[in-house]
Structures are given as structure tokens and as C-alpha cells.
């Protein structure tokens, strides 16, 4: 029932802290949630029998006004990776290429391959900055998207 090509992807293995080394890449913090967060979660739990309102319409309206852009130019999600994955999945086809500097966000190659496209990883400069010349040189007729992360700029 599932696409057989998806079987080649590795299972996610969460990182673990080791002794005095703390793994920060899992986006976990050592402290429990603040009491105000727990109270908000408790209130929200009482509404889990209802469909959520998709798209955060109030936030979208306010951001649209603040930024001076049309509402349909905004995408709201719980994290940037959801938006990146959806954008790649909606725009890429088998045989397309997506360029991004490497080393970068570990999920980029997975998102690209899940869409049926091929990742094209370009090198960073010696000081781990965006190698813009390498990105430009990698552009071909098959290039469908280029992902640039602010961390490298």
C-alpha cells in the first residue's frame, strides 16, 4: 500500500546525552514546562474532541497587516521543517533536483528524496559560510528549488 521506495529511509533514532555531554540537537530542554504552560495544556485538553482551526487565521491576519503582505503569501506551522517538507513535496517531481549547502539541516536530504527528487549538496566555504559560487554552479535544467539556511550566511 505504501510506496516501496520509502523503505530505504532509515528509522529515526533520537539522540541521547552521554555522561557530561548534553545533546542539544533534539530540541529538548532539561527543565519541566512552566506552570502557565501546563495550565494552558490542561485547558486545551478539554477541547480535544473538536477539530482544530487550521492555518492560525488570527495570527495570519495580524502578520499580514504587520508585514504588509497578502495573507496567502504566509505559511504558518509549528516549525520551519514542516513548511520546508510541504513545499518540497508539493513542488518537486521524480528527476528534479534540490540544491542546498551541506552540512546543513539533517532532514533536507530526506525531504528531497521522499518527494522523489535528488538532493544536490554544495560545499560550504572554509569558514562554514554559504558557498554561493558552488550553489550557482550546481544549477541545471533539473533544478526545482534551492534551500538557503540563514545559519550559513
Q: What is each of the regions a protein language model found here?
A:
Residues 56-97:
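Phosphate-binding glycine-rich loop
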Residues 24, 51, 77, 122:
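Hydrophobic residues at beta-strand termini and immediately following loops
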Residues 99, 145-149:
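Structural motif
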Residues 117-144:
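PLP-dependent aminotransferase-class I/II
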Residues 90-111:
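Conserved PLP-anchoring active-site segment centered on the Schiff-base-forming lysine
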Residues 151-153:
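Conserved small/polar residues in nucleotide/adenosyl-binding loops
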Residues 22, 96, 144:
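Conserved acidic residues
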Residues 1-50, 148:
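N-terminal "arm"/small-domain region of PLP-dependent enzymes with the aminotransferase-like
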Amino acid at each position: 500500500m505504501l510506496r516501496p521506495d520509502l523503505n530505504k529511509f532509515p528509522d529515526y533514532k533520537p539522540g541521547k546525552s552521554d555522561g557530561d555531554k548534553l545533546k542539544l540537537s533534539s530540541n529538548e530542554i532539561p527543565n519541566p514546562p512552566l506552570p502557565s504552560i501546563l495550565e494552558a495544556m490542561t485547558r486545551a485538553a478539554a477541547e480535544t474532541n473538536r477539530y482544530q482551526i487550521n492555518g492560525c487565521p488570527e495570527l495570519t491576519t495580524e502578520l499580514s497587516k504587520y508585514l504588509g503582505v497578502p495573507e496567502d503569501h504566509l505559511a504558518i506551522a509549528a516549525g520551519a521543517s514542516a513548511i520546508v517538507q510541504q513545499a518540497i513535496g508539493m513542488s518537486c517531481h521524480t528527476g528534479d533536483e534540490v540544491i542546498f549547502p551541506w552540512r546543513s539541516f539533517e532532514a533536507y536530504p530526506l525531504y528531497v528524496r521522499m518527494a522523489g527528487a535528488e538532493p544536490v549538496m554544495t560545499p560550504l566555504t572554509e569558514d562554514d559560510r554559504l558557498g554561493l559560487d558552488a550553489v550557482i554552479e550546481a544549477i541545471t535544467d533539473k533544478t526545482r528549488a534551492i534551500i538557503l539556511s540563514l545559519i550559513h550566511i
